[in-house]
């Protein structure tokens, strides 16, 4: 079959955009730990010496946002002025408003409740917080049912952070990126063609040392040996120097790494970001639900590859559309899989929140190294608890 290449990237927790994602989700978690019914849309921007936290938050609790900001930056590793960004000396500005009452009225009471289709007490009473379409994806390329390029890229970025924090490579600094190019034979990944690592470092270390150490301590422990061969290309800091990094090197914004957060470009994306948003925002909760559905379909053996699209209207509880695409790998027709999805998954916002127990402070841990396919943390949308039911029902169709 034809050989082809596919590439995905990831970034470390010290990347400027990821700093912002983590701050936004740290604020969300702090609020949810006191007020699980809060409405939160928290956006962050960082640049040299400055953090701006803004957005719309409606809650009955108080959280110390500057303290949360400094603590998050400290955990990431920007705790010294020589790194170009210091958690203790950077300025923190906040500008927070309440959620618009025009939006709140649609979320508080769904159209179905207003028109008498459902009672206020039923789960329909919560409407979607916005319109839009969200995608979820799963495939059998890895044990966690993720595309191999993004899976390896995340693991490399995570390893880069680990060797920095545990002192193995103590000259590394928090900012960094990874990129993996995988060669496919048809739709099967067969080898890694190129591995790219860019990592911030201290000025005292030479290029050859960095390249040797990164290959030995980051790449080889992560990439399975059977995927590497004599033709695999290793690119480490290809500019030759990466001392200035983090917010000193580039400004950062919440929600600017949506492809890193999801499937590395391997599947479609509806365009909505995740971090800083409470689960009434379907940009986040419905994307999690779509992954949950797709993963259970693949885990059930109904398809080797599955993409689920959900779409919503603001203030309306039920999805306006549900679509399943198995790319020709399904063992039963897609319309039958869609009927199983509608039967076994409650895709109304309140149904998603209830099924996945989303009104909890679980979000900061997702804000770096991907929201999907995580094996290092327990995320409810990664469960495959519906797979057996789907498998049994499919056998009877």
From Swiss-Prot:
Give binding positions for Mg(2+): 17
The pathway that the record names for this protein is: Amino-acid biosynthesis; S-adenosyl-L-methionine biosynthesis; S-adenosyl-L-methionine from L-methionine: step 1/1
Q: Where is this region: Flexible loop?
A: 99-109
Question: Where is this protein primarily located?
Answer: cytoplasm
For whether the record's keyword set contains Metal-binding, the answer is yes
Entries under Pfam families matching the protein: S-AdoMet_synt_C, S-AdoMet_synt_M, S-AdoMet_synt_N
Cysteine pairs forming cystine bridges in this chain are none
One of the GO biological process terms: S-adenosylmethionine biosynthetic process
- Gene3D superfamilies reported for this sequence: 3.30.300.10
Q: Protein name, please?
A: S-adenosylmethionine synthase
Keywords, alphabetical: ATP-binding, Cytoplasm, Magnesium, Metal-binding, Nucleotide-binding, One-carbon metabolism, Potassium, Transferase
Q: Which HAMAP family match?
A: S_AdoMet_synth1
How would you summarize the oligomeric state and partners of this protein? Homotetramer; dimer of dimers.
| Cofactor needs | Mg(2+); K(+)
Give the family, as the similarity comment puts it.
Belongs to the AdoMet synthase family.
What superkingdom does the record give? Bacteria
Q: How is the cofactor bound?
A: Binds 2 divalent ions per subunit.
Residues at which ATP binds: 15, 175-177, 241-242, 250, 256-257, 273, 277
Species annotation:
Acetivibrio thermocellus (strain ATCC 27405 / DSM 1237 / JCM 9322 / NBRC 103400 / NCIMB 10682 / NRRL B-4536 / VPI 7372)
| Enzyme Commission identifier(s) | 2.5.1.6
Q: Which reaction does it catalyse?
A: L-methionine + ATP + H2O = S-adenosyl-L-methionine + phosphate + diphosphate
- Which gene name does the record give? metK
Q: Where in the cell?
A: Cytoplasm
Positions annotated to bind K(+): 43
Query: NCBIfam families, from UniProt?
Result: metK
Does Ubl conjugation show up as a keyword for this record? no
């Amino acid at each position: 079959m034809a050989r082809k290449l596919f590439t995905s990237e990831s970034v470390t927790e010290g990347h400027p955009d990821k700093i912002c994602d983590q701050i936004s989700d740290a604020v969300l978690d702090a609020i949810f730990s006191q007020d699980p019914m809060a409405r939160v849309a928290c956006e962050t921007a960082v640049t040299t010496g400055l953090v701006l936290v803004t957005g719309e938050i409606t809650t009955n609790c108080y959280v110390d946002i500057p303290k949360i900001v400094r603590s998050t930056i400290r955990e990431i590793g920007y705790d010294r002025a020589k790194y170009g960004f210091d958690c203790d000396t950077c300025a923190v500005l906040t500008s927070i408003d309440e959620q618009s009452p025009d939006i709140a009225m649609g979320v508080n009471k769904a159209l179905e409740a207003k028109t008498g289709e459902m009672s206020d007490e039923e789960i329909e009473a919560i409407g979607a917080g916005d319109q839009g379409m969200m995608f979820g994806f799963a495939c059998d390329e890895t044990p966690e049912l993720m595309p191999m390029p993004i899976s390896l890229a995340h693991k490399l970025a995570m390893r880069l952070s680990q060797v920095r924090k545990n002192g193995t490579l103590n000259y590394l600094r928090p900012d960094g990126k990874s990129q993996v190019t995988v060669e496919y034979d048809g739709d099967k990944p067969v080898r890694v063609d190129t591995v790219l690592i860019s990592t911030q470092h201290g000025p005292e270390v030479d290029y050859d040392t960095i390249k040797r150490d990164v290959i030995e301590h980051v790449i080889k422990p992560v990439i399975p040996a059977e995927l590497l061969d004599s033709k695999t290309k290793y690119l480490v800091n290809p500019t030759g120097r990466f001392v200035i990094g983090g917010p000193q090197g580039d400004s950062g914004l919440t929600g600017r790494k949506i492809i890193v957060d999801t499937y590395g470009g391997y599947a479609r994306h509806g365009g909505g970001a995740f971090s800083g948003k409470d689960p009434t925002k379907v940009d986040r909760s419905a994307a999690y639900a779509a992954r949950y559905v797709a993963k259970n379909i693949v885990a059930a053996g109904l398809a080797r590859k599955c993409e689920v699209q959900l779409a919503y209207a603001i203030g309306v509880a039920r999805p306006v559309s549900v679509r399943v695409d198995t790319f020709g790998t399904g063992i039963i027709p897609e319309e039958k899989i869609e009927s199983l999805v509608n039967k076994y998954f409650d895709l109304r916002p309140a149904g998603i929140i209830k099924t996945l127990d989303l009104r909890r402070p679980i979000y900061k841990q997702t804000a770096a190294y991907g929201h999907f396919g995580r094996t290092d943390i327990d995320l409810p949308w990664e469960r495959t608890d519906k797979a057996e039911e789907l498998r049994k029902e499919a056998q009877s169709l």
